[in-house]
């Protein structure tokens, strides 16, 4: 509609919808950059985070975090950790 609340506006925009992703461990920052999609090994199963995701805090189990940006894929193995998502900023603390 014209009330500015239509979700279609942001998705049809030519601007790229990227999120900021930061993965940190006790050793320091493992990854800091942009991502269009991030997959996590959650306690109840794997889940994906896409732009405009609702705020979230979730525990992570052993597995692999996978992320994608401009067609390039990356991954980070983890033992345990947690993720916080807020305003297209994904903060991950892992061991």
Predicted regions and their residues:
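Short, Lys/Arg-enriched N-terminal segments with co-localized hydrophobic residues
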Residues: 1-18
């Amino acid at each position: 509609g014209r009330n500015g609340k239509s979700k279609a506006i942001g998705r049809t925009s030519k601007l790229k919808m990227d999120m900021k992703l930061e993965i940190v461990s006790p050793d320091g920052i493992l990854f800091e950059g942009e991502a269009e999609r991030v997959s996590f090994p959650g306690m109840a199963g794997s889940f994906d985070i896409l732009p405009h995701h609702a705020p979230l805090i979730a525990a992570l189990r052993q597995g692999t975090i996978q992320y994608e940006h401009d067609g390039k894929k990356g991954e980070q193995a983890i033992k345990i950790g947690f993720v916080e998502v807020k305003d297209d900023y994904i903060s991950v603390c892992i061991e």
